[in-house]
Swiss-Prot record:
Has antibacterial activity. Disulfide bonds join C28-C55, C35-C49, C39-C56. This is Beta-defensin 119. The lineage of its organism: Eukaryota, Metazoa, Chordata, Craniata, Vertebrata. It holds the Pfam family Defensin_big. It comes from Homo sapiens. One of its GO terms (biological process) is defense response to Gram-negative bacterium.
Amino acid sequence: MKLLYLFLAILLAIEEPVISGKRHILRCMGNSGICRASCKKNEQPYLYCRNCQSCCLQSYMRISISGKEENTDWSYEKQWPRLP
């Protein structure tokens, strides 16, 4: 009987516990967003994922619609025109 308890203890120590409710997170927009049925309060929906759920991006994410890398240098000189 002690051998059975020892075997069960070793078996439980080796196996990873199964957590119910833990699902694989589907990423979108180049791993910048998460596919969800509804976005959280601080997220904005953008396009749709393959499973017809919204691709939720953080509200501070900038999206380039031109397809090329944009200059993101937001220095003071680039924001305001020069005065003579």
